[in-house]
Each structure stands twice: as structure tokens, then as C-alpha cells.
Amino acid sequence: MNKGEDNLVRTSITVPEQLLQKVNELIASGYFASRSEIFRQALREYLQRIEWTERVGDEEYFGALTYVFQHERAEPELVKVQHEFTDVIISTTHIHVSPEKCLEVLLLQGPGKRIAELAKRIRGVRGVEQAKLTVVSSEGE
């Protein structure tokens, strides 16, 4: 158990049935001990990524922001956001996943704070279902 987790609190969440089925399959395969453990680990990882966006400064980073979205619902707002961040977006790739969904990958270079703000804005667009930011320092650290 991690430090600070000795006072666990019970809560409940609502997830799509297919997602819960995948969680149960991972547990049955031995990847995780329980549903609680998989959700705790996923939350820790997600919160660490979000916390980076809150503390990063103006150091230069390279990165990729990959996201899946509902085409008709999100695309107009996504285009607007992308136009506000042309200073850090160096390339965009767009793939049609299905008639309703698309995947985009933005290749990024620039101040970490600006990249973090872009990721925050993309995640906040209604219709974005998943978004993952991966960054590396230009210093190689």
C-alpha cells in the first residue's frame, strides 16, 4: 500500500459495461488483484500526468498529443483550439476510425507550459473521448 493510502474510502463509479468487462478480464488474467487496485493505479497515473501540466514551466519540450473524438460533436471546436496553438503544433495527422469517430495526433514543440495548456484545452472539448499527452524534454531528461 502506498503512503497516504491507509485511510481508504469506499466510493462508486459508473462505467460502460464493455469497459468493466475488460477490467474483469485483466483481473482474471492476473494483471491486477482487484477492481479497486486497477482503478487506484489508473487514477494515480492519470493524476501524475495532469499534475505535470500544472507545474511545468517554459522549458522546451517535444511531444505528441493523441486523442479520439466524435467527429460531428467536437471537430469545429478542435479546429478553433488548434488555430490558437499554431506556435507549438508542428504537424497534425487525422485518421477516420469509424463514420462517427476520428483520431488525431498533434506533434508538438515549444514551451512546456504552452503544450500543457493545449492538452488541457483539447481534453476539455465536448466529444473528446480520450486524450494522451506524451512529452520529452529537449534536454533529453
UniProtKB/Swiss-Prot annotation:
Gene3D superfamilies the UniProt entry points to: ACT-like. Chain A, domain 2, Met repressor-like
CDD domains cross-referenced by the UniProt entry: RHH_NikR_HicB-like
UniProt keyword annotation of Cytoplasm present: no
UniProt: Ni(2+) binding residues: 83, 94, 96, 102
Cofactor(s) listed: Ni(2+)
GO annotation terms (biological process): response to nickel cation
Cited InterPro entries: Acetolactate_synth/TF_NikR_C (IPR027271), ACT-like_dom_sf (IPR045865), Arc_rbn_hlx_hlx (IPR013321), CopG (IPR002145), CopG/NikR_regulator (IPR050192), Ni_resp_reg_NikR (IPR022988), Ribbon_hlx_hlx (IPR010985), TF_NikR_Ni-bd_C (IPR014864)
UniProt family annotation: Belongs to the transcriptional regulatory CopG/NikR family.
HAMAP family: NikR (MF_00476)
UniProt protein name: Putative nickel-responsive regulator
